[in-house]
Amino acid sequence: MEDQVGFGFRPNDEELVGHYLRNKIEGNTSRDVEVAISEVNICSYDPWNLRFQSKYKSRDAMWYFFSRRENNKGNRQSRTTVSGKWKLTGESVEVKDQWGFCSEGFRGKIGHKRVLVFLDGRYPDKTKSDWVIHEFHYDLLPEHQRTYVICRLEYKGDDADILSAYAIDPTPAFVPNMTSSAGSVVNQSRQRNSGSYNTYSEYDSANHGQQFNENSNIMQQQPLQGSFNPLLEYDFANHGGQWLSDYIDLQQQVPYLAPYENESEMIWKHVIEENFEFLVDERTSMQQHYSDHRPKKPVSGVLPDDSSDTETGSMIFEDTSSSTDSVGSSDEPGHTRIDDIPSLNIIEPLHNYKAQEQPKQQSKEKVISSQKSECEWKMAEDSIKIPPSTNTVKQSWIVLENAQWNYLKNMIIGVLLFISVISWIILVG
């Protein structure tokens, strides 16, 4: 019915104060009170944005709102908005209910109204504004119970666009780029077809729409290149191009590292590869190997760990045998050179499958590398002097020695004896 010519929400001053405002303050919010007038904070919006918060569409350039009173300065209310402030002008005007229809039979003064003019901070030299608010107060209650007022926003200018509830302000606070349709303040064709108001400010609508349009233009201006990065091709081949189909409209900006998730993991693996030989204790004497692959005859001997750089590298990442693998036997204790034990050259860890398939080729490589580093072997054997009874266990490439605990135990005993001797000397002296 409100869309029909001649119909609309046009309450007079007595109805606003005696019915709507009184019921809102007393908590008797009937259906007509809640549906007709919305509750907003007047100072949170500039007037050209405030009109969009009204529940009723108006062709009279009038919009109605409930506003809670906020006395931040004693009895004075704070009326500062984003772009300006509301200034109180003139004297208050009494609101009377002549017949008592709106105030439950009470006839006489039921309230008063005051006029406020908006001062636009964008134009400090301009003292007058086309935006006016009539603020209605209900006076039949004590001052501390008057928690709400009714504000009637009015436009006094001559701009015909303001008469439409969907129109934009002729001088918005923030002027966006109007060259693009997506950057316009309000999409008028969409709003005219909708039955609700746009509750967003013109600034937000303009900037958010423009930002989305710019992002879509960037995607269109950067098509996918004809060839992919090799790493991308690797991942595309393994994953069937699933990630590309999910993001077909987006351009890949950063190359995807297929073998590793990030660069730090690659660096860490490289460091382990280069320094793995230092992770194994150099004082290894005899090792007890729990692999199912054992030599035909039990052997014993001391096998130092640091053979050569090339041999160590092949041990770790090329799945070949290592010179550090030795077999300990309690039947024949003693020290034996690795060159005298050919069977050790084919001993591999349990998880090493390639070495077990090619024992002869790996044996030749071990013999050649052992001959090249004969001097290093002699120096290593001279530096390692550990009793044959020392047992070591190699589990997951980590060497554990019982000799270390014996050494620590002897050191502790020696310290205790030294302390006891010093104490005895002090007591005797």
UniProtKB/Swiss-Prot annotation:
Q: Which SUPFAM superfamilies match?
A: NAC domain
Q: What is known of its domains?
A: The NAC domain includes a DNA binding domain and a dimerization domain.
- The membrane spanning regions, by residue number, are 408-428
Q: Which organism is it from?
A: Arabidopsis thaliana
Q: Where in the cell is it found?
A: Membrane; Nucleus
**Taking the first listed entry, what is the main subcellular location of this protein, grouped into a coarse class?**
membrane
Query: What's this protein's name?
Result: NAC domain-containing protein 1
Question: What is expression of this protein induced or repressed by?
Answer: By cold, drought stress and methyl methanesulfonate (MMS) treatment.
Give UniProt keywords alphabetically: Activator, DNA-binding, Membrane, Nucleus, Stress response, Transcription, Transcription regulation, Transmembrane, Transmembrane helix
> What InterPro entries is this protein classified in?
NAC-dom, NAC_dom_sf
* Matching Pfam families: NAM
Q: List the disulfide bonds.
A: none
Q: Which domain of life is it from?
A: Eukaryota
One GO molecular-function entry = DNA-binding transcription factor activity
One Gene Ontology term, aspect cellular component: nucleus
**Record-annotated DNA-binding residue ranges:** 110-162
Q: Indicate how the chain sits in the lipid bilayer.
A: Single-pass membrane protein
Q: What does this protein do?
A: Transcriptional activator activated by proteolytic cleavage through regulated intramembrane proteolysis (RIP).
Identify the residues that the record assigns to the NAC domain, covering every copy.
10-160
What gene does the UniProt entry assign to this protein?
NAC001
Q: In which tissues is it expressed?
A: Expressed in roots, rosette leaves, cauline leaves, shoot apex, stems and flowers.
Which intervals carry biased composition (Low complexity)?
319-331
